[in-house]
Regions:
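Compositionally biased terminal segments of proteins
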Residues: 1-178
Length: 178
């Protein structure tokens, strides 16, 4: 479990050192709970680090080795299975939060995270994250959330029941409908 930005940064720094020792250069694009911790000072607990890994596949051995060596990491602590769930639209507003020999780490933009959290709609944690991201983006109307989602996903992919739940939640927090 990761509970602080410092924990994740230390772990990613170690990953970079191990990659560099093998002559590897890897880029991570972090999404999900880890992105909320790293980029948006959201106090949260996340079990893994969801990331798009480029090039894919080259770090599996290093990730497994770290889990075994440390003993406090699950084998899937760096989760690349999230890749098929990411928007196809490039995230032009992502930003580099860490660059060490062997590793460059970008965090998803608030817009992309908002769209991903809204699409996932998995319950209270995602609702809270959507609200935090609305504050960061200074959104005043629920319609702005759906505009961002449509722009990121290319079409409305938010399930109607999730859209209704998010709308109700955000309106209860002071966002207008229009």
């Amino acid at each position: 479990m990761f509970t602080t930005k410092d924990e994740i940064v230390a772990l990613l720094t170690e990953l970079g050192e191990r990659l560099d020792a093998r002559g590897l250069e890897v880029e991570l694009y972090i999404v999900g709970g880890a992105a909320m911790l790293l980029g948006y000072d959201r106090s949260a607990v996340t079990r893994d680090i969801d990331a798009l890994i480029t090039p894919s596949g080259v770090i599996d051995e290093v990730v497994d080795e770290m889990a075994k060596d440390r003993g406090d990491l699950p084998p899937d602590w760096l989760n690349s299975r999230v890749a098929p769930l990411l928007p196809r639209l490039a995230d032009s507003r992502s930003w580099e939060m860490l660059s060490v020999a062997g590793l460059s780490v970008e965090v998803a933009s608030a817009e992309h995270l908002l769209a991903m959290k809204a699409r996932a709609g998995r319950g209270p944690r995602d609702l809270q994250d959507v609200a935090v991201l609305c504050e960061i983006l200074e959104l005043r109307a629920v319609s702005q959330v759906w505009e961002i989602c449509d722009r990121v996903w290319g079409e409305s992919v938010i399930r109607p029941e999730v859209r209704a739940t998010i709308t109700e939640f955000l309106e209860s927090r002071g966002l207008s409908q229009a």
